[in-house]
Amino acid sequence: MKGTRAIGSVPERSPAGVDLSLTGLPPPVSRRPGSAATTKPIVRSVSVVTGSEQKRKVLEATGPGGSQAINNLRRSNSTTQVSQPRSGSPRPTEPTDFLMLFEGSPSGKKRPASLSTAPSEKGATWNVLDDQPRGFTLPSNARSSSALDSPAGPRRKECTVALAPNFTANNRSNKGAVGNCVTTMVHNRYTPSERAPPLKSSNQTAPSLNNIIKAATCEGSESSGFGKLPKNVSSATHSARNNTGGSTGLPRRKEVTEEEAERFIHQVNQATVTIQRWYRHQVQRRGAGAARLEHLLQAKREEQRQRSGEGTLLDLHQQKEAARRKAREEKARQARRAAIQELQQKRALRAQKASTAERGPPENPRETRVPGMRQPAQELSPTPGGTAHQALKANNTGGGLPAAGPGDRCLPTSDSSPEPQQPPEDRTQDVLAQDAAGDNLEMMAPSRGSAKSRGPLEELLHTLQLLEKEPDVLPRPRTHHRGRYAWASEVTTEDDASSLTADNLEKFGKLSAFPEPPEDGTLLSEAKLQSIMSFLDEMEKSGQDQLDSQQEGWVPEAGPGPLELGSEVSTSVMRLKLEVEEKKQAMLLLQRALAQQRDLTARRVKETEKALSRQLQRQREHYEATIQRHLAFIDQLIEDKKVLSEKCEAVVAELKQEDQRCTERVAQAQAQHELEIKKLKELMSATEKARREKWISEKTKKIKEVTVRGLEPEIQKLIARHKQEVRRLKSLHEAELLQSDERASQRCLRQAEELREQLEREKEALGQQERERARQRFQQHLEQEQWALQQQRQRLYSEVAEERERLGQQAARQRAELEELRQQLEESSSALTRALRAEFEKGREEQERRHQMELNTLKQQLELERQAWEAGRTRKEEAWLLNREQELREEIRKGRDKEIELVIHRLEADMALAKEESEKAAESRIKRLRDKYEAELSELEQSERKLQERCSELKGQLGEAEGENLRLQGLVRQKERALEDAQAVNEQLSSERSNLAQVIRQEFEDRLAASEEETRQAKAELATLQARQQLELEEVHRRVKTALARKEEAVSSLRTQHEAAVKRADHLEELLEQHRRPTPSTK
């Protein structure tokens, strides 16, 4: 179906009209299918400013005729209206749609604005591989007449568009690395020598990217039920290019039918929707698993951060970021200088060529043209590589350049979050690349108003734009997942939405091996510079080809007339004026873009500062809570220490009181004993005095009698000597008694003092030792905990860094195969977490209950033992006092016995001479004295026995007190061991809890290894199958060769037989002819 339509307008919007905006969430950059849209090698990050100059030239080349491919694409999502081709006069004042601007809301509702508006001469930007979509406003004069005449009436048309974001080389995420890998792979797989002009058929596709998209579509069809994608996006590109070529005026160019194009576009949209839905489901599952794992490891992370300083991690991260930023800026500066020099050289060459081309038409009449004439269609069709490259350049242009004019009515209303902040060097780089691409695109067709169809670049951009829109069947709100280290990589804060891109396909493991991506710090990579240079070269070649084709296709006339020369001069003047105007507009656009980028930079800096301040506040709160918890623990330890010291002091006070009571009782017993001894001494002295006086009186009587008998002098001598002896014995006895009493009292006091001092020293030494040991244990435990936490924090930081790096490397290859394993891991980890939590709670409650019971029992036992000890102490003191009294009595008795025996011996010796006279009286008196003394001795022996018993009791009490002290010390040591065991159990539980992450990580690595082993086995099986298939193909080839050889032999044999038969027939004919000829004899 052929036809033309006005370029400057699109179908009017009706309730059932065409609305190509696939409503829904605008997919992020790295998930969009723009990277797989062309067959040309994909360049990682190439920016193009689709300025007004190239669009005006394309319009002048395409003329009023609309492209059939654009009609087909615009009818792809409409069910009630099909745009019919229409013809009209060319309207050069109305700009064409270079990018089909469409609007999508996160809620999935239908937008009130039409899709028909497009950027005008102010220029438009379009980004493919960025993280965030950018919106820009369009001037009011950029709208076509049909869009302004829409039946929406006074309803305001919103022109803010969420364009595909820009993927520059400063994107340091894994998506950038995957994009580089895909770029390098496609560069290596598709060299420029393999490129060929596209076929006219719409089924022509690029084999590798088609396989990639089919692989992703097959995986998506498992959950959605859609069929296999029959055609590739590149086929849509070829179809658009072929349709463009067919509508430019060449006679009888073959085109695809409308139904086929609609069916193909519908299938592409369905496949895109399926893949997006499937990937979104997978992203949700991964996010849920990551959240559960994060919740599981959150407690451990808090323990890891509790002893670190408030700003240690943040300062380290800022230092690393500053160093990385410096290196990146230096590299960017060098690369920009090189790119600026090359672009300046290219521009100088282009300006020189343009000046020679402008001076050329008066000399070559074939290059002159009448302003109203149409040019052939070859002027608009550059090389296929150039077309594909232009599409890629347009896809990668920065989306931050607004196309606002004086009459702007459209304000940016993008709901998505602003794009990641770029430094000024990156913005300068993007603007430089866009300016270069805009200058390169100026070498397109020289005129804009004389062609019949739109260029293939616009159709490619429109097709990619339709494919990159989010489908309206899954309006899902965004969910931002911020991990612990999300502030460390603010560039990659955009959530992972789903789309059909080479990045996703590479992450799902559908791409084969490809080289390593460039390092993250490169701002202007070699691939980008090479792509810019190759694009400039191709554009120069295409411009030269266009000039050649103009020279070849132009019919020479008899000679240029003055009218033609004047028209050409006026045309060149108008073109130069238009170029000057467009340059001015481009300069205004760039100035606005620079201002917007500055505002955006300031806003992003403020947001980053706010996020960092919030995170710093969270960390400060966390550290303060940790410090408060530790201070509370230290206060609890201090309180426990105070309680123990108070208990110890109470025990010491009780011991002191007992000692004081004991000393008081000893003093009382000694005083009583002294009183009793004094009474006994007084009684003994009185009785002895009475006895002595009586004895003296009797002796005096006897002496008188003896004196009477003549013995008086001798008796007087004996009496005098006896008195002296008695006085001497009395003095000795009194001195010995005093000495013995003094020695006994001194010895008792000395022993009591020694015991008291020894007890005090032992108490002080034990208290000091206990305090020192407790302090050393606490200090050692505190140092060990700090060291262990520091080591564990460092180890976990290194492990987290290594784990992130390793997982980032492995996730690109294994994510599609590991979804089941991750779900199982999440279930097992959640079950294990619940079991461990329940077990830990149970153990903690049991430990607390057991500890409380043990404390209660220990308190009761301590109270009972204290009471028993007090009772035993009193008994021992009484026994000791009795023993001491007995000992004193025994000593007194022994001294007294000695004194009595001495007195008896002296008296017997003294009375030896008077024995005969006083024997009877002396014997009777001795008997009386012996009886009396024996009674007193028996009493003293009884008192001595009592004192001995009391002393033994006191000794037993002292031994019991020492045993009690030893037992209490043993109990203290036992409690310390129990406390150490509890601490060991606590440390073991803490280590088990810390090792939980390691166990989960080990299990995950084991499963990864198993999945890798399965992958290797599958690859080996695939290799065997391929080898078997190759062998079978070789066998078939061999059989075909043998069959062909046999056929050739049969044909050759038949040919020889045929030749022999022909020879035989010729021979027979000759013979027959000879027989027919009459013989000469017959004549």
UniProtKB/Swiss-Prot annotation:
A GO molecular function held by the record: protein homodimerization activity
Family: Belongs to the CEP131 family.
Cellular localisation: Cytoplasm, Cytoskeleton, Microtubule organizing center, Centrosome; Cytoplasm, Cytoskeleton, Microtubule organizing center, Centrosome, Centriolar satellite; Cytoplasm, Cytoskeleton, Microtubule organizing center, Centrosome, Centriole; Cytoplasm, Cytoskeleton, Cilium basal body
Positions carrying Phosphoserine: 14, 35, 47, 78, 89, 105, 114, 146, 150, 381, 453, 499, 731, 798
Protein name, as recorded: Centrosomal protein of 131 kDa
Family annotation (InterPro entries): CEP131
Keyword Nucleotide-binding: no
Modified residues (Phosphothreonine): 383
Organism: Homo sapiens
